[in-house]
Amino acid sequence: MARAVGIDLGTTNSVVAVLEGGDPVVVANSEGSRTTPSVVAFARNGEVLVGQPAKNQAVTNVDRTIRSVKRHMGTDWTVEIDGKNYTPQEISARTLQKLKRDAEAYLGEDITDAVITVPAYFNDAQRQATKEAGQIAGLNVLRIVNEPTAAALAYGLDKGEKEQTILVFDLGGGTFDVSLLEIGDGVVEVRATSGDNHLGGDDWDERIVTWLVDKFKASAGIDLTKDKMAMQRLREAAEKAKIELSSSQSTSINLPYITVDADKNPLFLDEQLTRAEFQKITQDLLDRTRKPFQSVIKDAGVSVSDIDHVVLVGGSTRMPAVTDLVKELTGGKEPNKGVNPDEVVAVGAALQAGVLKGEVKDVLLLDVTPLSLGIETKGGVMTKLIERNTTIPTKRSETFTTADDNQPSVQIQVYQGEREIASHNKLLGSFELTGIPPAPRGVPQIEVTFDIDANGIVHVTAKDKGTGKENTIKIQEGSGLSKEEIDRMIKDAEAHADEDKKRREEADVRNQAESLVYQTEKFVKEQREPAEGSEKVVSDETLSKVDEAISEAKKALEGTDIGAIKAAMEKLGEQSQALGQAIYEAAAAKAQADGAEGGAGSADSDVVDAEVVDEEKDSK
């Protein structure tokens, strides 16, 4: 049975994990790191770089490097590269493809099934887009799981049968979630969840960037925001400074040659940022985490003292100010230090993959929908059919009627959110139920059913009870991709995978050819210019043939025809072998001649053919 992986598709970093003998293992990527930057770059030569290689070249390729695309999931955002528009799903699929390849290299087998995590507060459009990204990457997405739920699963499964209440505080690179869960006897049940899909470590980085821009403008009189390359260097320096301030009281930000003045003289940026100053400029960001925390406690109907454990998830929770705030909010409770905040979500996803594949027994995961779902009714009111924090999968029906006499159809507009006025919420999609027989208003009976599957993806049906006519919508409008578009993107991704494979093979052939040319040139030089005391043993004719093959190989390497490089390499290999054989034959002939000479000169001497002395034996 093919194995399934768990993937934490993060805003700034992504992680893949797999079960080995029932235990989750985080898979290191091809660069040797356990986390992969969620960065995709389109190099000028047509190559697509993913992860650390993409991040490394960001400064010199700003316009063609895409990061933090998770913040655009479920929207109509696109980025244009070389005349082609890429959706967030396609960019995310590149990251997923790399994680898939790295996991396949580790396991030595193909992988198709995966559990992918999303922030608990992701709406339907964002979940649908994540699933589509998985499909484009060639993955069968078994389940979309909420990140805090996955973290609780990873944390709580080995904690015995005693029922416990766990608070998961998840502050990642681009999103924030807080969830309250109950774990006991193999059941992980989410009681309540809340969050902010536009709050994360990226925002803390951006504050440092703004602070540096203001400082530089005050000292040098130059606005760096107009220089894309300088801004990219500032972002990288800001991220580094933020990390350093988690363990130090101050950090030095030194960027030589950041820009030039009016006279083309190079200018340097050199600033000292203290932890106190950093906390001051980001205090409002920190305060934004309070409301979701209080909302979760209220929705779950518990008090802070009922919380048994606090689990921190996401690299941003390493900031001391975040840890201190969590302690304050939970009444002084010390957050659990036994989990790696960067890896725990992927570990939980791998466990859930094991549950779905039957490798992990006696575990039941009960997740919730993060936002209320409803339809727009007369007066633009949001009528909720499913309240937030309802355990999923779930199905709810309610009967509505017409607003006007002889109304032939009804427009069903599906919204997600907590506002009382429908238009203030997120419109997920709309569809029409037609063919309603003429009748006074209030007479037709229209049954609207909401069905949320285990991935948190919504299906809505409207049925006229009188005629039995019905219409169904699987909410997809939010992601903006039709099935045809997804299929096209899958084909594109497969084509790119073949292209990437071909590119790697081409690079291997080129490297082999260059190496063979270098080694053979060195060998020929040694034969032409023998060391002192040695003599030339190979004819000029043989060496000339090798020289000719070297020239052909060099010429082929100047071009891009891999077939020509292979042919030239084959010919050079043959000539190189012929050279080796000529050297061997010359050496053998010389040895024979020397032997004959030696034999004639010592015919009368006493020759001992072989005498073996065992010193150890003689000494006994």
Swiss-Prot record:
Database matches in Pfam families: HSP70 (PF00012)
Q: What superkingdom heads the lineage?
A: Bacteria
- Mark the residues carrying the PTM Phosphothreonine: 175
Induction line: By stress conditions e.g. heat shock.
Keyword rRNA processing part of the UniProt annotation: no
Q: Biased composition, Acidic residues: where in the chain?
A: 606-620
Q: Which UniProt keywords apply?
A: ATP-binding, Chaperone, Nucleotide-binding, Phosphoprotein, Stress response
Cited InterPro entries: ATPase_NBD, Chaperone_DnaK, Heat_shock_70_CS, HSP70_C_sf, HSP70_peptide-bd_sf, Hsp_70_fam
User: Which Gene3D superfamilies does its entry note?
Assistant: 1.20.1270.10, 3.30.30.30, 3.30.420.40, Actin, Chain A, domain 4 (3.90.640.10), Substrate Binding Domain Of DNAk, Chain A, domain 1 (2.60.34.10)
Q: Which GO terms describe its molecular function?
A: ATP binding; ATP-dependent protein folding chaperone; unfolded protein binding
Q: In UniProt terms, what function does this protein have? A: Acts as a chaperone.
What is this protein identified as?
Answer: Chaperone protein DnaK
What does UniProt list as this organism's lineage? Bacteria, Bacillati, Actinomycetota, Actinomycetes, Mycobacteriales
